[in-house]
């Protein structure tokens, strides 16, 4: 699978992901970019799950952002509704982590839109390791959001066999 982590701190929000794509227990590619900017660079998003499925969801989510003039929560809820009710979309297997200057959300294929505690998101096979590392760093250091995300991904990559050390990182700054 993969690891995606999002951290928000001191006027910065980061989403970072590794680059490993696997087919069963075989590494197919090591430099997949699972994190990208959407909606005129005002939203960042990362995915865990099937690559083709995730790119389809990115496109649909960007359309929802355009329909709702960039309102992240409304777009996320509308995508989740469609994902849950559309027969074809229901077959897509992926999780999305999305963020803008006001919110960080997880969108699932079950129709869930979750705003996590402490604006910390970690999804994918290495998610629990990245979440534990990021939480410890948030609570016990003054590292930046970007540094925390990078270190959390490094730790997850050391432990999870489906996570590598090729990182894609996107960051938004806002007035805290």
From Swiss-Prot:
Binding site for Na(+): 157, 160, 163
SUPFAM superfamilies: N-terminal nucleophile aminohydrolases (Ntn hydrolases)
Record InterPro entries: ATP-dep_Prtase_HsIV_su, Ntn_hydrolases_N, Proteasome_sua/b, Proteasome_suB-type
Induction context: By heat shock.
A GO MF label: ATP binding
Catalytic activity of the protein: ATP-dependent cleavage of peptide bonds with broad specificity
Compartments, record wording: Cytoplasm
EC code: 3.4.25.2
Family recorded in the similarity comment: Belongs to the peptidase T1B family. HslV subfamily.
Protein name: ATP-dependent protease subunit HslV
Biological source species: Escherichia coli (strain K12)
